[in-house]
Amino acid sequence: MSKFSFNEQTCIGCGACVRICPKGLIHMDTDGPKMDEAASKRCNNCGQCVAFCPVKASMQEFSKGIELEDALIYDPRRAPTILKFIKSRRSERLYSPDPVPHDNLMRVLETANYAPSGGNNRTIRWIVFENPEKTAELREMIAEWFDTVCRTHPVYSKRYAIDSILERYRGGRDVILRGAPHVAYVVGPENAVWGPVDTGIALGFFNLACEALDIGCCFAGYATKAGEWEKVAQFIGLKPGEKVWCAICFGKKAAHAVRIPYRGKVPLTLL
């Protein structure tokens, strides 16, 4: 069965789907665009044919029965607001203890799911600590990782000020997860060529989606590295052959930025 079809009643035969397919899998036949079965085996459901059809005639088997949203049409009047929104994003280290509502969490994850990936292979998987009590367990487990594994680790024993971290943590200052009620891990196959890149892009989408709902984020390096420890890996539900690519902590903001700090000149070479 072909992964591509079209509405014969609305198709205008413009060939947009043919031109836009990244792999050239669609061709124009006498009665409209076609994707044969051999080509379908190479189709990775990227959705370009559906996205760019001007009359919404192109269809994917993959999204059959799903009501598709209209894309936001470019409007130059929105550009200043969108650019300022992106620049206004800050790493959040002060959180409300109240958990993020489930519906908002799912809106964020559904948006992050649209992040591009190498070859549209989409190999990453999300593990999200929605329950703050589970987050507290993870936090304590990371402290244990510092006090055991890190002390004898050839790199981490030198990289981290372990005694200082643990002293502040045990004194009531959460320098491990910054008091965040939630943590999200991005994991995937350990042999995924574009795993680190796909993860960075996905977390960028996640972070900006959070900002749209007044949720703050901070990349969680300690949680990421602790994911190498078998005890943490088992606790978060890592599957055989998977590895932790990165973690991010998040929650409702307890503080809001009022200005955008200067970042200096762009390090740049134009060729």
PLM feature spans:
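Small-aliphatic-rich amphipathic alpha-helix that forms the alpha element of a beta-alpha
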Residues: 12, 108-112, 182-184, 189-235, ...
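Extended interfacial segments that mediate partner engagement and assembly in macromolecular machines
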Residues: 70-113
